[in-house]
Amino acid sequence: MKSVDLKILDARMREYLPAYATPGSAGLDLRACTEASLVIEPGQTVLVPTGLAIHIGDPRYAAMILPRSGLGHKHGIVLGNLVGLIDSDYQGQLMVSTWNRGTQPFTLDPMERLAQLVIVPVQQVAFNVVEDFDASERGAGGFGSTGRG
């Protein structure tokens, strides 16, 4: 199994290193590496530092920053860009675009779990211009064409 070297930018993170919660966990929790609590007003989007830098270094892998379901469902706190994609050659600190889509201000405390990091395989593709496609059962149907009528 490929391991990814995560570099720590902030010494406070020693006590809060990301870890898989269970053997079946896909994501690692990312924390708000801030000096003080941050109030995010309804409709506001802020960039929150995580204190972690990542360099995957292998183009067969990428990382995705995903929301934590409880924050979105209970408090309206989601990712401002919905999903953060981290390319294998990126070497900077991970920042979380955090959007309060709720109706109440939300206080984000230092080291609070904010998002999840998932490492995923990547397949780069080559394009081939063709005259037509081989027929498939679905064809060009989209936008619910295989569900309710």
Curated annotation (Swiss-Prot):
Signal peptide: none annotated. InterPro entries: dUTPase, dUTPase-like, dUTPase-like_sf, dUTPase_trimeric. It is an enzyme of class 3 (hydrolase). GO terms for molecular function: dUTP diphosphatase activity; magnesium ion binding. Substrate binds at residues 68-70, 81, 85-87, 95. Its EC number is 3.6.1.23. Its cofactor is Mg(2+). Pathway: Pyrimidine metabolism; dUMP biosynthesis; dUMP from dCTP (dUTP route): step 2/2. SUPFAM superfamilies: dUTPase-like. The keyword Signal does not apply. Pfam families: dUTPase. GO terms for biological process: dUMP biosynthetic process; dUTP catabolic process. The keyword Membrane does not apply. Keywords: Hydrolase, Magnesium, Metal-binding, Nucleotide metabolism. Coiled coil: none annotated. It catalyses: dUTP + H2O = dUMP + diphosphate + H(+). This enzyme is involved in nucleotide metabolism: it produces dUMP, the immediate precursor of thymidine nucleotides and it decreases the intracellular concentration of dUTP so that uracil cannot be incorporated into DNA. Belongs to the dUTPase family. This is Deoxyuridine 5'-triphosphate nucleotidohydrolase. The gene is dut.
